[in-house]
């Protein structure tokens, strides 16, 4: 979500990495967060263990007091960083409480995604309505799960380099990681010079990719698996005008 303050445009953002290295993990994630400080003027937060480091820069949209990130699950087994806004989070929250007995620590849409994942698993991505990019870390299995919204409104970049998986809202956060190697992607550069845009899933940096819209991923420390949870169909439907409006 965008918000104007004193003629400056801000939006939330996150950065993170998975993998070991001969460096100070807390210092690296803090520096990665500083690279995207312009995205979140309200607060910052981080989570670091021996496998993963997550950093967040926050612009308050919903739940000013209770939405600081990263957010941990009540049982302490999962942690999430999230950029975006979920329009139907109240409906999902109600279902989680009434049908599954879930308890919430905050009123934020972020925690709804986290509890939804713990309850429904990977299916939660297709249940969300809104614009979003997020990563959830399982502290017990040391696996990652993340997703990007249906139409790619919220950015999500990733790179696998020297045994590390880097991910975030902006590529510039990767520049603060010791394993990141800067190299121009000549194929993407050609596309940009032709179209003034890079239509590929690649970016101007070699080895850095966009997570496709309508896609979620899992990562176990070795293999990154991507799954398409949404693919628009254009088959003609025999619906009335009122039915179509309701679906929209």
Features from the language model and the residues they span:
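Low-complexity, intrinsically disordered or signal/transmembrane-proximal segments
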Residues: 2-3, 9
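Cysteine-centered catalytic environments shared across enzyme families
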Residues: 8-248
């Amino acid at each position: 979500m965008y918000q104007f303050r004193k003629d400056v445009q801000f939006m939330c953002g996150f950065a993170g990495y998975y993998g070991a290295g001969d460096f100070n993990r807390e210092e690296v994630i803090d520096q990665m967060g500083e690279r995207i400080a312009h995205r979140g003027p309200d607060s910052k937060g981080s989570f670091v263990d021996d496998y993963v480091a997550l950093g967040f820069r926050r612009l308050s949209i919903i739940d000013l007091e209770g939405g600081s990130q990263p957010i941990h699950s009540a049982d302490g087994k999962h942690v999430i960083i999230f950029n975006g806004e979920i329009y139907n989070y109240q409906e999902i929250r109600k279902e989680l409480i009434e049908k599954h007995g879930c308890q919430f620590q905050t009123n934020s849409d972020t925690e709804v995604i986290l509890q939804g994942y713990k309850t429904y698993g990977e299916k939660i991505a297709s249940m969300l309505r809104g614009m979003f990019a997020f990563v959830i870390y399982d502290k017990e299995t040391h696996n990652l799960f993340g997703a990007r919204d249906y139409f790619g409104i919220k950015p999500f970049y990733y790179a696998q380099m020297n045994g590390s998986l880097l991910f975030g809202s902006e590529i510039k956060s990767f520049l603060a990681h010791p394993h990141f190697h800067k190299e121009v992607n000549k194929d993407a550069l050609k596309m940009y010079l032709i179209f003034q845009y890079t239509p590929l899933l690649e970016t101007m940096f070699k080895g850095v990719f966009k997570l496709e819209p309508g896609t979620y991923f899992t990562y176990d420390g070795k293999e990154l698996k991507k799954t398409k949870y949404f693919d628009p169909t254009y088959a003609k439907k025999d619906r009335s005008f009122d039915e179509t409006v309701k679906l929209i």
